[in-house]
Amino acid sequence: MQEPLRIVVIISDPALVAEGDEQAQAIEERSRLLRIGLLEAGYNLVATLPADVFLTERLAQLQADMVIVDAESDARDALEHVVMATRDARRPIVMFTNDSNTQHVNEAVAAGVTAYIVAGLAPERIHPILTVAMARFKREQALLA
């Protein structure tokens, strides 16, 4: 039997979230649903981390197989940290967001995001999304080899 994927979820920096903010509460609920969906699907959720300057070292220590970015208002900053943290040890990056702006989608894919999922965080969809993301990542890596 294959070991479950080791997944690290990157979240919005909690210091940037104002208490009582409805958007922040919606983001927190989405993040909770994501974590529940990962655990229910049998994934090994090894950490939930903020996107910060320590991310490269943390990802190296945790040896994650896949990185999931769950961010909204600071998604660009989070993505920049994730891309920098994974440039030497490539791994699939899946981004869950409510931002359907075409320019942001294109920028994320150009930066190395394997799957950019807009408004698709139903727990039952997580496993198929991650399966496709991993298959796409492996295919891209084979083409680069």
What kind of region is each of these model predictions?
Residues 14-48:
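Two-component/phosphorelay signaling modules centered on CheY-like receiver
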Residues 20, 26-31, 51-57, 65-84, ...:
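Conserved phosphotransfer microenvironments
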Residues 60-62, 84-91, 111:
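Conserved phosphotransfer cores of two-component systems
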Residues 67, 90-100:
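A short, hydrophobic beta-strand element within the central beta-sheet of small alpha/beta folds
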Residues 103, 121-130:
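C-terminal output helix
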